[in-house]
From Swiss-Prot:
Function: Plays a role in the ovary in limiting the number of primordial germ cells (PGCs) that develop directly into gametes, allowing them instead to enter the developmental pathway that produces germline stem cells (GSCs) from PGCs and ensuring lifelong production of gametes from these GSCs. Negatively regulates epidermal growth factor receptor (Egfr) signaling.
Native organism taxonomy: Eukaryota, Metazoa, Ecdysozoa, Arthropoda, Hexapoda
Biological processes per GO annotation: negative regulation of stem cell differentiation; oogenesis; proteolysis
Primary subcellular site in the record, as a coarse category: membrane
Annotated knockout phenotype: Increase in the number of differentiating germ cells.
Topological region Extracellular: 149-879
GO CC annotation terms, alphabetical: plasma membrane
Cystine bridges: 163-168, 186-868, 194-826, 254-504, 732-875
Protein name stated in the entry: Protein gone early
Gene responsible for this protein: goe
Family affiliation: Belongs to the peptidase M13 family.
Length: 879
């Protein structure tokens, strides 16, 4: 057998063993006596080849027969066998054979070499496949290692438990209904909070019906009236004279107004005008020869409850024990604010008002030329009244809110028949010249007296007749109602007519508020709710009241702390207000003792008679009933009667009101049983809604507290702390706004500026109270003044769970508060009227669009809660 070693042909596969061409051969025969090392020069062509090299680099064997190849293979096998039989194994002779560590390394690398040899023995395509797979696996392993090393921490809100209760889902639905959380709260704040508000209004049943501004308040009012309409429809048929029948009868009579035709309306108007001894514009009148305005004013006030020059009410006095006292203030005018009688007034509103006056006269049969004169005379006479009042208020040092004997007031204002009016309005009360009354502004009474004494009978007669007709117009036939709606278009913007069910539901609520709330708060309904919810612990009414108590004490405590920081209030005044807050109590709805008396409600409305043929005639009887309730307040009342009187004898009963007589916060149960508030809603949502409502009711009465302090203290001058307190820094609040806005804010009435101050102060205080409330829950500490077992109460109300709500899972308490509060200022106006500019003059409240921007700019908590930049400086005169 011949193996051609001299013709060694290197190939690509020879690299597997070229790196170790030097080796040692151990002579088995000389192994005992000594080892002869034979070292070959690495890379020489004479170096013996290994077995694998021999296999890979032998000649193609064209001159070798298969028999020669087989013989060579057999020789190799025999050689190996012989070495094994003789106890000797051929060993490679290497320079490092004497070092065991090197041999160990070679032994370790030997399996890798064999794997590599096996890989090289494969075909090229299979080698590429295996190498690619190995690279991909290595890359995948590297990616996994990098992901494990740099994987971000899972946010808390994704790990926090999610609340899936019905109330949590409902609160989320309410917030997401108007919000567009895909927008940036820092750069697109309104779109973030109210992005879907306008589109929801466009799809609402109230679309183009609400006059002026559709906002959160009007949205809730619509929901309330809609529920009341359904409630009235479900009232059972009761016997004649019951409260249920009175409510149903009033509602039906209101719905039937459309059957009244113009001739009947003319007859009703003329009958009412004859009751005030005629109108000089009628041709058949006696041309005012025997007409006496003092006698007419007494009839107009006592019979119809209309107060054209001075207004009579019964309010709380400023001296302890804050008993009721007859109060006199300036009277009513045709336009909503004195601004509209100025030289720079809104021309569209003035033109609409004159058109209303003119069309009324024409409908009453007055020819066009005289109707135009009538309109001009009324407007200019009302302007004279405004000018006299403003001149009287020019002196900032004049006395206000002064108790005066009627004899002294008669000397001050001899042309006003005040004594005669009071004797007619309160016939069961002894009214004499020694009776003391509270006069809001004695100088205004004097100015009005001068005006009457210097006016002719004709403008006085026109003004009194118009005051009577203006109150009747909305309840007459369609021809007269259209006149009032046309003026509303000039004032609020062009809208559709209110649906009749909405008007009548509002009439029932405003005229019979105690009956409506009492029927909705019947004990049988509560007992049924308690029985059905007993197995689940607290029912909604109980839970709402318990949480509201905690919120009230938390808000009160924060309000006291905010007062401590109000250095713009004198220390003695701050202490007085804090004392009032410490002694304040809380009342939910009508007392249970009242509802448990089966005859209380019937006796309350015993004097109300609604048996008239036409709805407009109810006006007189409703006023007679209200007048009797006012007179009862002048006598001794039981505590239950005082609570009912404080809640329902106001001109506009509020769901949350403060009683100066009782130093008590009154919260309607209708409100706390609605979807506006629920103890299972997130705490932040409740603080942003009903929490700010409570604070606004309290802060709004701080001016009254200061008047009480003025009356009871001799250390404070008559510098009218109410005015200083209620006036915010207009220049600061309007910083960064157009100059026109600064001018408009300075032109606002004190009531409008006061509401602005109240809104901002309430929001800031509520945000701080929320933080303290949440910290108290986390720490398990009690709310100061609440007097509760905090551990059981917090657990029963579910306050310790701190669950996230669906759809807003990433929002913490502060962000939820911000979103909920900002949505209270969502609004949209009628397209053809810039109502935002005149809203403060019409409603004594700033437009919601401005309040939205002002609260975001001047309440630092709101932008900071959403990680937005906030102004560091704060405006003065804010809590």
């Amino acid at each position: 057998m011949a193996i051609n070693q001299g013709k060694y042909k290197p190939s690509i596969c020879a690299i597997d063993e070229v790196d170790d061409r030097s080796f040692k051969l151990h002579n088995s025969q000389d192994e005992i006596g000594g080892k002869q090392q034979l070292q070959q020069i690495e890379g020489s062509e004479t170096a013996p080849l290994t077995t694998n090299q021999q296999k890979l680099h032998m000649d193609d064997g064209s001159h070798l027969t298969p028999k020669d190849l087989e013989a060579a293979r057999q020789d190799a096998l025999n050689e190996v066998a012989a070495g094994g039989a003789g106890g000797r194994t051929p060993a490679a002779i290497t320079p490092n054979s004497t070092h065991p560590s090197a041999n160990g390394l070679r032994a370790l690398l030997l399996p890798g070499r064999r794997s590599f040899d096996a890989l090289m023995s494969l075909s090229r395509k299979r080698r590429i496949l295996y190498v690619t797979t190995a690279c991909l696996c290595a890359l995948l392993l590297l990616i996994i290692i990098l992901l494990l090393a740099f994987w971000p921490e899972v946010p808390f809100y994704l790990r926090a438990p999610l609340c899936l209760d019905k109330e949590c889902v409902e609160s989320s639905r309410q917030l997401l209904l108007w919000a567009n959380t895909s927008k940036s709260p820092c750069h697109e704040t309104y779109e973030w909070a109210c992005g879907n508000f306008a589109s929801d209004y466009a799809n609402h049943e109230y679309f183009v019906i609400k006059r002026g501004e559709w906002n959160y308040e009007t949205y809730n009012e619509y929901q309330e009236l809609n529920e009341l309409n359904r409630f009235i429809a479900m009232l059972p048929n009761s016997q004649e004279g019951s409260v249920e029948s009175t409510v149903s009868s009033l509602y039906r009579s209101c719905r039937e107004t459309d059957v009244l035709d113009k001739s009947q309306s003319d007859l009703l108007l003329k009958r009412a005008i004859n009751a005030v001894y005629g109108w000089q514009a009628f041709r058949d009148s006696n041309r005012l020869q025997s007409w006496e305005y003092k006698r007419v004013l007494v009839v107009l006030q006592a019979k119809h409850g209309i107060f054209p020059y001075y207004r009579v009410t019964v309010e709380n006095g400023f001296s302890n024990p804050h008993d009721y006292v007859i109060t006199l203030d300036e009277g009513e005018l045709g336009l909503p604010d004195k601004y509209f009688y100025g030289n720079d007034a809104d021309e569209e509103v003035v033109r609409g008002y004159k058109l209303l006056l003119r069309d009324f006269a024409i409908n009453m049969g007055i020819v066009s030329r005289e109707a135009d004169l009538f309109a001009d005379d009324i407007f200019h006479y009302e302007r004279r009244i405004v000018n006299h009042i403003e001149d009287a208020k020019a002196d900032a040092n004049r006395p206000i809110n002064k108790l005066m004997r009627l004899a002294d007031l008669k000397i001050k204002a001899p042309s006003l028949p005040i004594l005669e009016s009071l004797q007619a309005i309160f016939p069961k009360t002894k009214i004499t010249e020694d009776t003391e009354v509270l006069v809001r502004d004695p100088e205004v009474m004097h100015a009005l007296s001068v005006l009457l004494s210097t006016s002719d009978k004709k403008p006085i007669n026109n003004f009194i007749v118009w005051s009577l007709a203006r109150k009747m117009l909305p309840h007459l036939s369609k021809e007269y109602r259209t006149l009032a709606e046309t003026f509303d278009h000039a004032l609020y913007g062009r809208t559709a007519s209110y649906p009749r069910w909405l008007i009548c539901s509002k009439v029932v609520r405003d005229w019979l508020p105690f009956a409506v709330d009492a029927l909705q708060q019947q004990p049988p309904r509560q007992q049924f709710e308690t029985m059905t919810s007993k197995s689940r612990g607290l029912n909604k009414t109980q839970g709402n009241e318990e949480l509201l108590k905690l919120m009230f004490f938390s808000l009160r405590n924060q309000l006291k702390d905010s007062l401590e920081q109000a250095k713009w209030l004198e220390p003695a005044a701050r202490q007085f207000i804090q004392k009032k807050l410490n002694e304040m109590r809380l009342q939910f709805g009508i007392p249970d003792e009242v509802l448990q008396q089966p005859t209380y409600l019937a006796q309350y409305y015993n004097e109300l008679i609604l048996n008239n043929v036409f709805f407009v005639e109810h006006l007189e009887w409703i006023w007679t009933f209200r007048r009797s309730q006012m007179e009862k307040k002048l006598g001794p009342l039981a505590i239950l009667d005082v609570i009912v009187s404080e809640m329902y004898t106001r001109d506009n009963p509020q769901a949350i009101a403060y009683s100066n007589k009782l130093n008590m916060l009154l919260v309607s149960k209708v409100l706390i049983s609605s979807n506006y508030y629920d103890y299972r809603y997130p705490v932040a949502v409740n603080f942003a809604r009903i929490g700010t409502d409570i604070l606004e009711a309290l802060i709004d009465n701080f001016s009254t507290f200061l008047l009480q302090f003025n009356t009871q203290s001799t250390d404070i001058s008559d510098a009218a702390p109410e005015i200083r307190y209620a006036q915010p820094d207009v220049n600061c609040l309007a910083a960064g706004q157009p100059p026109r806005l600064v001018h408009e804010l300075n032109e606002l009435s004190s009531n409008a500026l006061k509401s602005f101050h109240v809104t901002l102060s309430a929001a800031r205080t509520a945000a701080r109270a929320l933080s303290n409330f949440v910290n108290a829950i986390d720490a398990g500490s009690a709310i100061q003044g609440s007097g509760i077992d905090q551990a059981n109460t917090y657990e029963a109300l579910g306050l310790t769970r701190r669950l996230r709500i669906p759809g807003l899972r990433s929002f913490n308490e502060n962000e939820l508060f911000t979103l909920s509060y900002m949505q209270q200022h969502c609004s949209t106006t009628i397209a053809d009227k810039d109502y935002a500019r005149i809203k403060p003059l019409v409603e004594s409240q700033l437009a919601e669009s401005y309040l939205f921007n002002a609260t975001w700019q001047h309440i630092q908590f709101l932008p900071r809660s959403t990680n937005c930049a906030a102004a560091e400086a704060t405006c003065s005169n804010l809590l």
